[in-house]
């Protein structure tokens, strides 16, 4: 039909757009293996698929390797590195179905060469978004972040990707932990007091595991734990149990009294306590800014700001003009209300920032909004005081005289 005469119809979508925060953020893991010719980065849809890939990468007597073959290879020294140790542990404990980037550092007997390979493997993760079209939100490095040079590259990569991670302090006491923790200052990194112990099914023995790696995996598990509201990404890791047998370093924890964990908490160090299982205790960053020391708070506002970017992108260069800006504002407002309803936030408001949205800015098509909001606080201390009084003596009289 002609568009000049007759009936013409069309439709358009008007109003706020939905904003979604993913509960299954990609994870990047740096592991070491002698089964690669050079450093190499891989992508998998899950950790299980990653493990199967590396098992099937080589054959034994013309057949696909089994876990028994892996155990034999580790025992005779033909398999070196920590790749299988950690991937097998992960698949034994959890089903991690998230986009998974594995950056493999080539194993070397030369410690300096191995260190260089690990640093390069960490640095290469910055290219994961362009290579695999995924943006790692969590980065884990098994075993090696106690080295200051490796730790610095790790933190630099985390900041480049606006991700988050953990640092293994591997301390023997609180004083050493405090000294090591002072070497770092980042709102995206959580220092960990000591490593963890668990049964290694590949060596049939108790083994030491990097707390950095285990908490990186655990962060994914907690993210996916809320299947109803899907806001597990806003949960703290503190006071949650880990599927491990023990911590390498004992920390005195006395419920209701002062103990060793208080000193560690005051110095923004996460520890592990034994209370009805092995639990994560404290979840802070090592930032110097008090407002950025709550790792949960940092993650919440990170995720909110990222989610809004995708939602308001369609309004850029819109032919609707100022109506598009109004719809963008409605989109952000509805998102904040949704987060309040899901108890991630306790309140919030959005307004046009007129100090920045000047007449000149409007002429250039630039509009600025301020969102004033607060995260739902997590109780870290609940004090209870019992006071002995005699104001209930009347009950005694009534009991005797009844």
Predicted ranges, named:
Residues 291-356:
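Acidic, low-complexity glycine/serine/threonine-rich segments
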Residues 153-154, 328, 350-351, 383-387:
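Composition- and surface-driven signal marking solvent-exposed, interaction-prone regions
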Residues 356-402:
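C-terminal edge-of-domain segments
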Residues 56, 259, 334-338:
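Short, intrinsically disordered, mixed-charge
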Residues 4-5, 148, 326, 330, ...:
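Conserved structured core elements
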